[in-house]
């Protein structure tokens, strides 16, 4: 099937069997032969918008006669001979020059037809003829509509009430793509006036360099190959007896420059049709008329855009039309499946799989729609949003050949209408290359053969097109090919939907057209000639309402339109394609016309947010962050067509092309756009909204002195309002701060536009508002509040949710809540103003939360704001004080932990009155009382106000710890006393480490006073339980907290104070006072009874327990000695050390036990190992505090200490000895050595092993005079049998200090005196220690600072009175530590970590009577040189060496100076 309008007469027969065609080159008539060819998919062809010349055709029907149509005269400026007159010959008469079509269409079926057809040959005259031959046997659904609205002064006017029906039918001539029955479409031509085609401009655009001889010469080069394919087609069809014109692509005729615009189609001079039969049936009469009209020559060529569309009434029909620079959307109530393949120019095409509205050739989804835009008179067109691949359109001076063809998958192109991919604008009007088609072959039945031939021919043309591209860019060859379309997979599919709901519409857009008849909706005066569907926004003429198809709106039916892919070879995943040649050739640019500014079109890659990528198939994809418009899917919601607006990507290209160079940054993107007018009664431009600007582009300004653009800063807009009056029923007025007013009229969607504009203003005001708060700009914030208050109170949308806010990309200056920012700035005035503003606009900002769940109250605590800010927040009526953050903490939790002001009690009370739960637990189980323990500034004040408001002190967290555990861990004695006074239970065992508060205090040992306090309270609690006096526990605890030893202070007055009035209870209390030894179980054995009787007379502090063996658990043996064994065990959940002695029946054992127990029971100090109780049966046991790190002896042997550790250990040992010596009565240890100083897990040193310890009393003088202890640690007076006193303990302490110093310096341990070889006999040591001539002591390492050596010398001085006490030694040691800290480097140099050389051997001393005098008189033993003397000699030698070296250097310098 082909459609041609040749310059020469082309006659086509109506019947395929006996029709013939004759071509005469001398004939300049335009003949349109419509005969009984194969059924075609083309139903309507329309050329619109020509300015001066009109091709007016009016067809009058005759069922039995052929029809000729007269065409207007066209004058061409080309060398080709132009026709001078135009006639349409018909046997029965002439036709009027205008064909008018009715908007209503009916359908009927023709079951039969005639096989006869007539052919006519044109004579040699200057008439352009259109001959229509009637063939009834094979009716074709082909209807033609030439022309548009006639001029008012035209003499050929048509009565609007008269019309002609065009009968269009389809026959089942192919099993592949036609229905099983014939159809004919009766189209009543009675539509409003339409615009006509300026045929003169078609001729004027033919380049003068082209002649028919060149065309024929090019044609003959390929004639043979085309004839071969034609012969094959004829053999397959067996019914083609006419020499039809086939598409021939010669060397020059196949040139298709990739830079050419679709406007080159305006140079087409003729249109021909062959093998297309049309039955034109009228309603009643069959008359024929002929008329001739003359035309007026046009002085300026008009640029056109072709459009191809499918008709909604005939699925197999295509509308080919031309319009001036306007994009008309296809009807929104249907979607079409893609027929197979249509190919268009590669230079300015944009391909996609989903399109209905393309500037240029408009094809439905998947049909091969082409988007080709150009800019006549400088009016920028909408860039393509969706399109499909289209091949070249071959154009000729004699004909345009429109044939079905296969889609050439090798042809790939991308076009954006305004710009190429490289960013250069396309040429507005390139000169086409024209070819003369002399042979055309169509196929009727065999679709496969025809498709293959056309594919081969098409590939040759495509290859040659690229070959010729480099030689010339002035020639464009366009070709539209369309093969037989299978009806089943590619026919349009309409899913069920509902009926339209039309309402009257005042059409004010001159570019708007009816979705049914495609005619303009707008006319003067404005009236209600149009109707709009309330559901899908379909706009049609009032007369076209009956033709409207069913409404697919989602409001009535959720059905969606299925768009299957008609071409499986071309994958739908390819969104757009572009060949390298077409991309590179698009760099040529042309000047746009009519702009006051002429900005160059930006490339896609230069627009922020757009990205070009390529895949393996050389296809280019345009990606955008805002919207993916390259739709590959087959199911699309019909609501997509509700609003007739451009896509975001297309709008972005338009926007940047129009307003580039106008001061708008490139990162500005149009959020939305609307068709409207400025101070006008009709819509003539487009309004763009960006985040910072309101931009208007005037499409009807042709004066170069006037600007097309109007730009308003959003920040400069003072107010907006709706206007509805007179001829401006839908207007928006914008007033700026500089007293300018802009009225935008005739919005199609004014409510949406106003809503978006209002949302944009509120967003800008919010930005200014936020910037002022973040910058702590109080005046700026006040100004923003005044404007925003007025806006919010007068806004149209009360819910405050604007759709445009989801499109805005500009973030706020801070992610924080604005009120929080003001609180962080600690600006009282700003916070108060904000609170008043939020109250005025009924905002709940006071309770807003951030990403972590923090409210402004939470934030106020962390910001350390003033008390006034906090009180203003609490005084807000709607403030919620129980809001939790992501950790479950309320503002009260953080307030108790973080707040530092002494006014905290007033604020806590205010929060409690507002409803804060004082016992609220966070996700860790902590209450505000737990948090208050961590407050370092107002801890007691916080705890007091919480306890005053009845806070529960025994609530435990997830680890089972109460607030008392927290106080013990932090060592807060004052808080612990306050909690205990409020009823805190010290016996609560935690879940984490299974410890009570007392056990935790002992382990941590942060504050010894807490341990002592908890021990006393534990004793009181146990005593009251034994005597069944638990109800007085709280009163006695309070008394104990106020003053220690409440049990010892019990008297009648105190009993009255605590409320004890019962005589029996008072007797129990007095008995408790006298028996401070608390016995749980009575003794059974005689030895145990003796011990108990002796223990009752002892002065036992705070009451020690008699423990049953069943309460102990032995876990590990840790040592043994002469007096017994030591085990590690557990008592009441506490790790203890259990010293097991012999049986209580042994008298010596009882005596030693009672003395040691008496000393331990009388001592209460954190420097002494604690005693928990005793076990009397079956063996005597002492239950004492466990020290996990062992003794000092084991500690220094395992890990040699540093100087810091040395001072720490010695200070604690001296403190422990001082505690013994300061006790009443005084306790003398008598066995001081490194083994008897224990170290717990916190490296705290405690004095232990009091088996040899005695009270320094007169009754113990005999015992104290006995030699006891380890010989190397014993003082000389002990060996001589003199009285043992506290300074004897200090001698032993000097030896212990030497042991530790030796480990520090040499990094190893040595027993005292071991440096003297083979002197291990204790008697020999005692002899040398007490010798009057020689005083033997351990050797102090060389280099030890003198201040420390002096202290050691004093401690082991032979003269008892010269030795310091424990207190004096502690003071001297503090001086040594101070000097160490001041000269740390010098002290560190002493540490050598090398063991010294042994000193000379000392001869052994024999044991015989008179040995002392013998050795003193006869033994010639040289005294050992003092280490101090050796050290001084070494230092003196070093000094002399340094002085000699300095003298030598000085002499050398003097000699050098003399020589110079």
Swiss-Prot record:
The listed locations are: Cytoplasm, Cytoskeleton; Membrane; Nucleus
Q: Binding of ATP: at which residues? A: 1118-1126, 1139
Catalytic class of the enzyme:
transferase
Instruction: List the cysteine pairs that form cystine.
Output: none
Give the region (Interaction with 14-3-3 protein) as residue ranges.
467-667
Question: Can you say where the ANK repeats lie in this chain?
Answer: 814-843, 852-883, 887-920, 924-955, 959-988
What region holds the Protein kinase domain? 1112-1375
What are the record keywords, sorted?
Answer: ANK repeat, ATP-binding, Coiled coil, Cytoplasm, Cytoskeleton, Kinase, Membrane, Metal-binding, Nucleotide-binding, Nucleus, Repeat, Serine/threonine-protein kinase, Transferase, Transmembrane, Transmembrane helix, Zinc, Zinc-finger
List, alphabetically, the SUPFAM superfamilies matched.
Ankyrin repeat, Cysteine-rich domain, Protein kinase-like (PK-like)
Protein name per Swiss-Prot or TrEMBL: Ankyrin repeat-containing protein kinase A
Question: In which organism is this protein found?
Answer: Dictyostelium discoideum
| Name of encoding gene | arkA
């Amino acid at each position: 099937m082909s459609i041609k309008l040749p310059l020469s007469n082309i006659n086509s027969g109506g019947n395929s069997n006996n029709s013939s065609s004759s071509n005469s080159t001398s004939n300049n008539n335009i003949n349109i032969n419509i005969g009984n060819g194969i059924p075609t998919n083309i139903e309507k062809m329309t050329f619109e918008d020509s300015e001066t010349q009109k091709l007016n055709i009016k067809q009058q029907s005759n069922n039995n006669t052929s029809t000729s149509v007269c065409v207007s005269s066209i004058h061409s400026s080309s060398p080709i001979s132009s026709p001078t007159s135009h006639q349409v010959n018909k046997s029965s008469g002439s036709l009027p020059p205008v064909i008018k079509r009715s908007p209503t269409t009916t359908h009927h079926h023709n079951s039969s037809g005639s096989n006869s057809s007539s052919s006519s040959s044109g004579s040699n005259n200057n008439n352009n003829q259109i001959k229509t031959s009637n063939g009834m046997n094979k009716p074709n659904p082909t209807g033609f509509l030439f022309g548009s609205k006639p001029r008012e002064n035209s003499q050929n006017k048509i009565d609007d009430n008269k019309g002609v029906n065009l009968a269009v039918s389809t026959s089942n001539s192919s099993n592949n793509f036609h229905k099983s029955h014939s159809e004919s479409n009766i189209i009543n031509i009675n539509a409003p006036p339409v615009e006509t085609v300026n045929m003169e401009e078609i001729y004027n655009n033919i380049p003068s360099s082209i002649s028919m001889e060149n065309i024929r010469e090019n044609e003959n080069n390929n004639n043979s190959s085309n004839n071969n394919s034609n012969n094959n087609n004829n053999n397959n069809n067996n019914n083609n007896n006419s020499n039809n014109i086939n598409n021939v692509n010669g060397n020059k005729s196949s040139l298709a420059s990739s830079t050419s615009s679709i406007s080159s189609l305006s140079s087409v001079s003729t249109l021909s049709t062959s093998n297309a039969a049309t039955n034109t049936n009228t309603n009643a009469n069959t008359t024929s008329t002929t008329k001739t009209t003359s035309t007026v020559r046009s002085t300026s060529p008009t640029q056109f855009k072709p459009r191809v569309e499918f008709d909604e009434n005939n699925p197999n029909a295509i509308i080919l039309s031309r319009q001036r620079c306007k994009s008309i959307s296809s009807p929104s109530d249907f979607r079409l499946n893609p027929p197979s393949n249509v190919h268009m120019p590669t230079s300015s095409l944009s391909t996609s799989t989903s399109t209905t509205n393309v500037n240029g050739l408009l094809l439905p989804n998947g049909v091969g729609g082409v988007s080709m835009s150009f800019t006549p008179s400088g009016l920028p067109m909408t860039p393509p949003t969706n399109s499909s691949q289209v091949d070249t359109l071959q154009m000729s001076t004699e004909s345009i050949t429109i044939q079905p063809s296969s889609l050439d998958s090798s042809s790939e192109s991308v076009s954006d209408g305004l710009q190429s991919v490289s960013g250069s604008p396309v040429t507005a009007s390139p000169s086409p290359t024209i070819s003369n088609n002399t042979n055309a072959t169509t196929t009727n039945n065999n679709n496969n053969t025809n498709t293959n031939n056309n594919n081969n021919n098409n590939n040759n043309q495509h290859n040659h097109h690229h070959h010729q591209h480099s030689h010339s860019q002035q020639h464009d060859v366009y070709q539209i090919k369309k093969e037989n379309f299978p009806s089943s997979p590619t026919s349009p599919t309409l899913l069920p939907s509902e009926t339209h709901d039309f309402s009257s519409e005042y059409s004010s857009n001159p570019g708007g057209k009816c979705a049914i008849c495609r005619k303009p909706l707008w006319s003067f005066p404005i009236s209600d000639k149009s109707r709009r569907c309330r559901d899908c926004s379909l706009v049609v003429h009032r007369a076209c309402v009956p033709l409207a198809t069913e409404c697919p709106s989602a409001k009535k039916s959720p059905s969606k339109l299925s768009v299957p892919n008609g071409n499986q070879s071309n994958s739908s995943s390819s969104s757009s394609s572009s060949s390298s040649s077409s991309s590179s050739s698009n760099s040529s640019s042309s000047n746009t016309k009519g702009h006051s500014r002429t900005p160059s079109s930006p490339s896609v890659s230069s627009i922020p947010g757009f990205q070009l990528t390529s895949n393996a198939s050389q296809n280019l994809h345009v990606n955008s962050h805002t919207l993916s418009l390259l739709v590959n899917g087959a199911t699309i919601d019909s609501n997509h067509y509700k609003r007739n607006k451009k896509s975001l990507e297309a709008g972005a290209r338009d926007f940047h092309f129009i307003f580039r160079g106008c001061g708008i940054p490139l990162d500005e993107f149009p959020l939305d756009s609307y068709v409207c007018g400025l101070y006008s009664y009709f819509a003539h431009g487009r309004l763009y909204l960006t985040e910072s600007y309101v931009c208007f582009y005037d499409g009807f300004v042709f004066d170069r002195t006037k600007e097309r653009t109007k730009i308003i800063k959003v920040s400069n807009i003072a107010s907006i309002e709706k206007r509805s009056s007179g001829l401006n029923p839908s207007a928006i007025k914008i007033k700026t701060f500089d007293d300018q007013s802009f009225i935008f009229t005739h919005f199609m969607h004014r409510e949406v536009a106003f809503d978006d504009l209002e949302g944009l203003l509120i967003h800008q005001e919010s930005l200014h508002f936020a910037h002022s708060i973040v910058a702590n700009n109080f005046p700026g914030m006040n100004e923003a509040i005044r404007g925003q208050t007025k806006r919010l109170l007068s806004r149209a949308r009360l819910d405050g949710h604007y759709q445009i806010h989801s499109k805005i990309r500009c973030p706020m200056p801070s992610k924080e809540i604005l009120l929080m920012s003001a609180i962080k700035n600690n600006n009282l005035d700003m916070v108060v103003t904000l609170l008043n503003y939020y109250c005025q606009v009924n905002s709940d900002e006071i309770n807003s939360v951030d990403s972590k769940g923090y409210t402004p109250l939470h934030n106020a605590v962390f910001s350390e704001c003033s008390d006034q800010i906090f009180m203003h927040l609490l005084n807000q009526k709607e403030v919620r004080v129980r809001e939790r953050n992501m950790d479950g903490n309320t503002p009260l939790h953080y307030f108790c932990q973080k707040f530092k002001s002494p006014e905290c009690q007033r604020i806590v009370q205010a929060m409690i009155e507002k409803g804060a739960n004082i016992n609220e637990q966070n996700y860790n189980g902590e209450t505000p009382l737990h948090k208050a323990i961590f407050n370092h500034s107002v801890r007691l004040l916080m705890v007091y106000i919480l306890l005053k408001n009845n806070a529960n002190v025994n609530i435990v967290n997830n680890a089972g710890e109460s607030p008392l555990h927290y106080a013990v861990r932090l060592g807060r004695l004052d808080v612990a006393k306050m909690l205990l006074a409020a009823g805190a239970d010290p016996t609560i065992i935690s879940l984490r480490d299974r410890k009570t508060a007392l056990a935790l205090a002992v382990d941590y040992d942060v504050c010894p006073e807490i341990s002592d306090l908890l021990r006393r309270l534990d004793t009181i609690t146990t005593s009251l339980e034994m005597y069944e006096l638990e109800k007085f526990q709280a009163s006695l605890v309070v008394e104990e907290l106020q003053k220690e030893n409440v049990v010892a202070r019990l008297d009648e007055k105190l009993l009255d104070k605590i409320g004890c009035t019962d005589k029996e209870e008072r007797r129990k209390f007095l008995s408790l006072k006298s028996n401070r030894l608390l016995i749980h179980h009575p003794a059974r054995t005689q030895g145990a009874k003796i011990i108990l009787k002796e223990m009752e007379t002892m002065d036992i502090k705070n009451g020690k327990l008699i423990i049953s063996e069943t309460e102990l658990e032995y876990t590990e043996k840790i040592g043994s000695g002469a007096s017994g064994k030591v085990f590690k065990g557990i008592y009441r959940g506490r790790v203890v050390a259990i010293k097991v002695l012999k049986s209580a029946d042994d008298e010596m054992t009882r005596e030693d036990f009672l003395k040691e127990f008496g000393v331990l029971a009388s001592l209460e100090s954190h420097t002494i190992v604690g005693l928990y109780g005793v076990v009397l049966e079956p063996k005597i046991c002492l239950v004492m505090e466990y020290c996990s790190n062992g003794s000092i002896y084991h500690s220094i042997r395992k890990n040699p200490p540093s100087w810091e550790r040395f001072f720490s250990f010695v200070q604690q040992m001296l403190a422990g000895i001082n505690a013994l010596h300061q006790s009443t009565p005084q306790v003398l240890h008598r066995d001081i050595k490194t083994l008897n100083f224990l170290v717990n897990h916190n490296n705290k040193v405690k004095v232990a092993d009091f088996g040899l310890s005695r009270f320094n009393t007169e009754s113990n003088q005999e015992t104290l005079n006995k030699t006891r202890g380890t010989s190397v640690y014993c003082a000389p007076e002990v060996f001589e049998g003199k009285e043992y006193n506290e300074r004897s303990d200090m001698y032993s302490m000097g030896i212990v200090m030497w042991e530790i110093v030796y480990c520090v310096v040499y990094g190893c341990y040595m027993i005292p005196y071991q440096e003297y070889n083979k002197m291990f006999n204790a008697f020999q040591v005692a002899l040398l220690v007490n010798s009057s001539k020689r005083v033997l002591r351990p050797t102090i390492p060389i280099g030890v600072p003198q201040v420390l050596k002096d202290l050691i010398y004093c401690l082991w001085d032979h003269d008892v009175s010269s030795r310091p006490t424990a207190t004096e030694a502690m003071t001297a040691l503090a001086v040594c530590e101070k000097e160490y800290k001041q000269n740390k480097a010098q002290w560190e140099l002493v540490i050598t970590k090398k063991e010294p050389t042994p000193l000379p051997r000392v001869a052994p001393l024999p044991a015989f009577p008179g040995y002392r005098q013998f050795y003193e008189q006869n033994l010639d033993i040289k005294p050992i040189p003092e280490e101090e003397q050796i050290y001084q000699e070494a230092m003196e030698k070093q000094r002399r060496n340094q002085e000699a070296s300095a003298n030598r250097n000085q002499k050398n310098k003097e000699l050098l100076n003399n020589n110079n």
